[in-house]
Regions:
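Cysteine-cluster motifs in flexible loop/terminal segments that predominantly coordinate metals
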Residues: 41-71, 200-205
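Helix-loop-strand module that forms the ligand-binding subsite of alpha/beta enzymes
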Residues: 55-146
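Short, hinge-like loop/turn segments at secondary-structure boundaries
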Residues: 50-54, 131, 160-161
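N-terminal beta1-alpha1 ligand-phosphate binding loop
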Residues: 2-29
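A short beta-strand-loop structural module common to alpha/beta enzyme folds
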Residues: 32-41
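Glycine-rich phosphate/pyrophosphate-binding loop and the adjoining helix
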Residues: 140-205
Length: 205
């Protein structure tokens, strides 16, 4: 079993440290992890060209397609981001928009979790923003004893956020349990049946 972890910070600071805290718990539960830094280089946004409908992947062959292959094989995904203006890192959002729109493999029952790190505020807005990618993709969202937030400005300051780090450890433990439970359920019952063709309703016609 494996969890793909995306570090949405251009630095290995508090967001990266938050993911590391979770990775230790995953390892203790026998789950492999991979932390991928996604904001170190510019990531273009979606151009709405529709080419992915034919190709099955984004026409811009960059980190998005590389991460799509990793997600395809993973049992879970953690997205971590610093907070910029009560939102996630812009490069991360560009990546996620293209990743979830262009990758057409079934993400049903891959477990998701979002982590937001800030100096002071904006974490819950960012947390909600990131969770939207999971809830539109049939991915159960793991929860903890509190919202998955960490606090610190300078690299390493999150070490002083005892409650935040504990929340992340509980999150990883709960996510481990959920991943294992879903694996057993899939083995015994299979995935939920889907209707043959998705329905699309426009609000203007």
């Amino acid at each position: 079993m494996k969890v793909l972890m995306l570090n949405g910070s251009p630095r290995k600071g508090n967001t990266y440290r938050a993911l590391e805290e979770m990775a230790k718990v995953f390892a203790a539960n026998g789950i492999e992890t991979e932390i991928v830094d996604v904001a170190k280089e510019p990531i273009r946004g979606c151009q709405a060209c529709g080419a992915c409908g034919k190709l099955g992947k984004c026409v811009f062959d960059d980190q998005v397609n590389e991460i799509a292959e990793k997600l395809k094989e993973a049992d879970g995904m953690v997205i971590g981001s610093p907070v910029y203006y009560a939102s996630a890192n812009g490069a991360l959002i560009s990546l996620l928009d293209r990743l979830f729109y262009s990758s057409h493999f079934d993400k049903t029952m891959k477990v998701g979790a979002a982590v937001a790190v800030a100096r002071r505020s904006g974490t819950t807005a960012t947390f909600d923003e990131l969770n939207k990618y999971f809830t539109i993709s049939g991915m159960p969202v793991a929860s903890s004893r509190y919202w998955n937030n960490g606090y610190g400005r300078a690299a390493g300051e999150i070490e002083q956020d005892a409650e935040g780090l504990q929340t992340l450890r509980v999150l990883a433990a709960n996510m481990s349990f959920l991943i294992k439970s879903i694996a057993l359920g899939k083995e015994k019952y299979g995935l939920p049946e889907k209707e043959e063709k998705p329905a699309f309703t426009s609000f203007i016609r």
